[in-house]
Amino acid sequence: MIGNWNYGTGRRKSAVARVFIKAGKGDIIVNGKPIADYFSRETSLMIVRQPLELTNHGQTFDIKVNVNGGGETGQAGAVRHGITRALIDYDATLKPSLSSAGFVTRDAREVERKKVGLRKARRAKQFSKR
């Protein structure tokens, strides 16, 4: 705990989010912007708010987030993971409910690298029989 802030780091794909939460009125600031201005997709906003809604803390915390790397979906997943870890730092009794919802586990899926001799990671050149 840093002062009266609770901290959590979240990661998803190549995105990393540093999340700070403290008691407040429910403001979420991402990279200096309100969350609705930062994330344009409604699904991204929903993903970020999932752990707060699950624990009924939607309007009880002010959240500051620094996130970099990746795209919008990866950043939203990283912020969700960071908020989850910060909530656990705030109150460890929330961990079972967050864990059963699958928010504590880091999504380890990464982009598969392109292989030599193939067009993409798995896509080969079109095969011609004749």
Swiss-Prot record:
Keywords: Ribonucleoprotein, Ribosomal protein. It holds the Pfam family Ribosomal_S9. GO terms for molecular function: RNA binding; structural constituent of ribosome. The keyword Ribonucleoprotein applies. GO terms for biological process: translation. It comes from the Bacteria. One of its GO terms (cellular component) is cytosolic small ribosomal subunit. The keyword Ribonucleoprotein applies. InterPro entries: Ribosomal_Su5_D2-typ_SF (IPR020568), Ribosomal_uS9 (IPR000754), Ribosomal_uS9_bac/plastid (IPR023035), Ribosomal_uS9_CS (IPR020574), Ribsml_uS5_D2-typ_fold_subgr (IPR014721). Belongs to the universal ribosomal protein uS9 family. This is Small ribosomal subunit protein uS9. The gene is rpsI.
